[in-house]
Amino acid sequence: MSQLKQPDDIDVADTRWHLLYRVAGISALITAALILVQMIIFILWPPPITAIDYFKLFQDNSLLGFLALDLLYVVDNVLLVPILLALYVALRRTNVSFMIVAAALGFVGIAALFASNPAVSMHVLSARYAAAATEAQRSLYMAAGEPMLALYAGTAYHLSLILGSIALVVISVVMLRSRTFTKATAYMGILSNVLALGLYVPRIGIYILLFSIIFLWVWYILVTRSFFRLAQGLSQDVMQ
């Protein structure tokens, strides 16, 4: 059983943050919806593997080309910016040092993803490949596309995944010591992001990562509810 009360570890009286909480709540809700859309797209239209396959996909359907190169994942990370800011504001009084570190890791992870995503470049190369007059020109564009895909699946992407997961684990640990968010929210955050790092388990890593998305989706739903409560100046104190 739970009851609503004015929390003592956040500035509910400071209405300056209410808009941020509302924006973060909307962002988290949109992200939860996008996760479902991404799963459907992944099942119905598995992403290509080679540069030439991406070129053909862009030529057939540009939108599917961008979606295959994680357009919605980029949008997720844009929406993560207000979410991280709101989490910092809500939890900074519980442990400001941890929250500064977590926010910094999260923003570096977002920047790494933005820097590594090759969607626009691959779209341009696809158009040039289609317009090429000779086989030599087409080979040149194919040779340019493969390194882009390799780089995207390389250091920057993994840095984004690792830093983002660590950031949300740290934030979730801080949640455990706060009455601002439920314990269930904290545990979902820890579980989903620890499992995400299971990507590096040989052979089954990708399946562990995909499994983690279920718990991440639940986490987004729970933080959505909490942000909307905070936007009203309320927090949930869970009786355990």
Q: What is the predicted role of each segment?
A:
Residues 2-240:
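Hydrophobic, aromatic-enriched alpha-helical segments typical of multi-pass transmembrane helices
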